[in-house]
A protein has these predicted regions:
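Transmembrane-helix motifs of polytopic, lipid-linked glycan transferases
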Residues: 60-83, 117, 121
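Extracytoplasmic catalytic/substrate-binding loops of multi-pass membrane glycan-assembly enzymes
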Residues: 5-17, 29-45, 52-59, 109, ...
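Perimembrane helix-loop-helix junctions
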Residues: 125-133, 154-187, 191-192, 197
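Loop-to-helix entry region of an early transmembrane alpha helix in multi-pass inner-membrane enzymes
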Residues: 32, 36, 40, 50-71, ...
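Hydrophobic/aromatic-rich transmembrane helices and adjacent perimembrane loops
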Residues: 17, 106, 112, 144-149, ...
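Short acidic/glycine- and proline-prone juxtamembrane loop motifs at membrane-interface regions
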Residues: 11, 34-35, 101-114, 311
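Hydrophobic, aromatic-rich transmembrane alpha-helices
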Residues: 76, 244-287, 299
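Short helix- or helix-capping micro-motifs
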Residues: 92-100, 124, 141-145
């Protein structure tokens, strides 16, 4: 009942839908400021639709988005089983399913639902040190890079999670190395296409302008093709201002955003969950450590982006991992 099927998509979801229509007609041109993974996924469904009414494509994108978001509820149950028994895994799924910000986003036809789903799947497989699971995890990390431009950050986060969690395990470097090869194979078609289009396999319209003082200046720099590198910022404002604005400022912005996303109920549970996770005895310490590494490294690596673009959507992918910590106090109160 939250979905209005009477109006077409607009803004970012309009661009994704138009790109998906183009893909279904054989045009795989990559836009300079967003990934094409979601639009390619949508195009597989659009290829079965023959309509002159754009509203039909808009509504199909919404339906697919809702379906993907719904499937994440089942996947987080599987991830939660690494931490809890069946009862509390079900609680984890329920808490995740009723997060209002994610529910609202899921009806928009945007890329966040499939982004979250793919990251969750990658994290699920990386919790196992067997070669086949590490390989699957890094293949999924490659798909994440297709979906969003910040997918490379997720690859680094997944890599850190694996390397720091399983550093004492036998063959962990061999498994990771083989997984990276598959990651590169998955990523290479996108990189080659970008190289053909822009002469740079890692091209983005934000490239060279990310270290702007604020979002307005970032857009102005992109429009005027003005470069603003980290070196330029340090030269003009000093190293202290650089760390204060992009690292500390981004970190504070991230915490503020996560607090807003934790309303209406996670903000009560999460502080206790964080505290109890430091002395977890009902969960494997290895998995708790992996969850901590994923959350902290994600916040730190996203700090520069969040300092300039404090957009809530950029941190939606962290919510499943915060929900896991939020279930720990429920388990403690119930069991002890």
């Amino acid at each position: 009942y939250l979905v209005d099927f009477s109006i077409p998509v607009h803004s970012d979801n309009l661009a994704y839908t138009l790109n998906a229509i183009a893909h279904s007609n054989g045009d795989f041109t990559q836009p300079p400021h967003r990934g094409i993974g979601w639009s390619i996924f949508l195009s597989t469904f659009f290829s079965f639709v023959d309509s002159d009414n754009f509203l039909d494509y808009s509504n199909l994108s919404r339906i697919v988005s809702i379906s993907v978001a719904t499937s994440s509820i089942f996947l987080i149950y599987g991830v939660a089983r690494k931490f809890f028994d069946e009862r509390y895994s079900l609680v984890t799924s329920c808490l995740f399913a009723f997060l209002p910000h994610l529910n609202h986003n899921s009806i928009m036809g945007l890329s966040e639902p499939i982004f979250i789903l793919t990251i969750l799947a990658s994290f699920y497989f990386i919790l196992n040190n067997k070669l086949k699971f590490v390989t699957i995890s890094l293949i999924l990390a490659g798909l994440v890079c297709w979906i969003r431009l910040n997918g490379l950050i997720i690859f680094i986060v997944i890599s850190l999670t694996y390397l720091l969690t399983f550093k004492k395990s036998q063959n962990f470097l061999r498994n990771y190395g083989i997984g990276v090869i598959f990651f590169i194979l998955v990523l290479s078609p996108m990189l080659l296409q970008k190289y053909e289009q822009y002469g740079d396999p890692f091209y983005s319209s934000y490239q060279g302008s990310m270290f702007s003082e604020n979002y307005e200046q970032l857009i102005s720099n992109i429009d005027s093709n003005t470069k603003s590198s980290a070196f330029d910022y340090i030269q003009n404002h000093g190293i202290a201002a650089f760390f204060g604005n992009f690292l500390l400022g981004g970190f504070v912005n991230s915490l503020n955003i996560l607090f807003q996303l934790s309303i209406p109920y996670l903000f009560i549970l999460l502080p206790f969950g964080v505290l109890f996770s430091l002395r977890a005895f009902d969960q494997k310490s290895q998995y708790i450590k992996a969850n901590w590494i994923f959350i902290i490294s994600s916040i730190l690596l996203m700090s520069v982006i969040i300092s300039v673009i404090p957009e809530k959507r950029f941190l939606f992918f962290l919510m499943p991992f915060l929900v896991i910590f939020s279930v720990i106090p429920i388990q403690r109160v119930t069991e002890y």
